[in-house]
Amino acid sequence: MRIGQLARITGVKSETIRFYEREGILAAPPRTKANYRDYGPAEEARLTFIRRARDLGFSMARIREL
């Protein structure tokens, strides 16, 4: 799935997903031949975990460690 689809499913903005990738909190997914990010179930699960951890008050540094 593309970043927009992942954003809609998880409730996390596309810009935030890109930020998490740059910071190494979310692994960058493989790219399609057209150079689109190609997210799968593992990235969706990780992003959902990150969102819930943030809601519980975990710092970004702590989430990166988990």
Segment roles from a protein language model:
Residues 2-9, 27-33, 38-66:
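Arg/Lys-rich, alpha-helical DNA-contact motif
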